[in-house]
UniProtKB/Swiss-Prot annotation:
UniProt keyword annotation of Electron transport present: no
PANTHER family, alphabetized: DEHYDRIN XERO 1, DEHYDRIN XERO 2-RELATED
Sequence repeats: 16-21, 26-31, 126-133, 183-190
Region feature (2 X approximate repeats): 16-31, 126-190
Lineage of the species this protein comes from: Eukaryota, Viridiplantae, Streptophyta, Embryophyta, Tracheophyta
Coiled-coil segments on the chain, per record: none
Compositionally biased spans, kind Basic and acidic residues: 165-188
Compositionally biased spans, kind Polar residues: 1-14
Protein name listed in UniProt: Dehydrin DHN1
Cell division found in the keyword field: no
């Protein structure tokens, strides 16, 4: 019977087939609040009502364009209202993966890391920083000129060519729990975490 209620009357909250209240959600499943306010008024009252519709781009990209902030509500005459407020500006997306620059050259140290201040790093980004062989925080010492001057083998450079220098501390504290990073390092091949137990 709930489907027959308020057919021609005032717009009230939506209900499901059992009469339970249902919240409006946007296309991504985020709840929408803002009855009575449209456009700029809804945005000022509720913050960014409906959320910014910034579609996902690849990591490390910078998206310049229109950021649509939408507000939903009812108009004073009973007609459903929908207002948009375009905001122009820069929206930084991505979490700073290394770009692969810094290879080659004549023995220069290049520190490849994009720092986006204000961005939060995810767990995977923190893990990738700690693992050797990833490009998250790499100090390249690709010394093309150092090999022939007696610092190492021909073309070898100082240290390992193209590898990052990571100080790894392998502590075995018996009786203490291992951290998440230690457990992950043990699972990955080539990280030196396998102790042979």
């Amino acid at each position: 019977m709930s489907q027959y209620q308020n057919q021609y009357g005032a717009q009230t909250g939506m209900t499901d087939e059992y009469g339970n209240p249902v919240n409006q959600v946007d296309q991504y499943g985020n709840p929408i609040s803002g009855g009575g306010f449209t456009g700029e008024a809804g945005r000022q009252h509720f913050g960014t009502t409906g959320g910014a519709t910034d579609h996902g781009h690849g990591h490390g990209q910078q998206h310049r364009g229109v950021d649509q902030t939408t507000g939903y509500g009812t108009h004073t005459g009973g007609v459903g209202g929908y207002g948009t407020n375009p905001e122009y500006g820069n929206t930084n997306t991505g979490s700073g993966y290394g770009t692969g620059t810094g290879y080659g050259g004549s023995g220069t140290n290049e520190y490849v890391r994009e720092d986006h201040h204000g961005d939060k790093k995810g767990v995977m980004d923190k893990i990738k920083e700690k693992i050797p062989g990833t490009e998250q925080s790499r100090t390249n010492t690709d010394g093309a000129g150092y090999g022939s001057t007696g610092y190492g083998a021909s073309g070898g450079g100082i240290g390992n060519t193209g590898q990052e220098y990571v100080r790894e501390e392998h502590r075995v504290d018996h009786g203490e729990k291992k951290g998440i990073m230690d457990k992950i390092k043990e699972k990955l091949p080539g990280t030196g975490g396998c102790t042979g137990h």
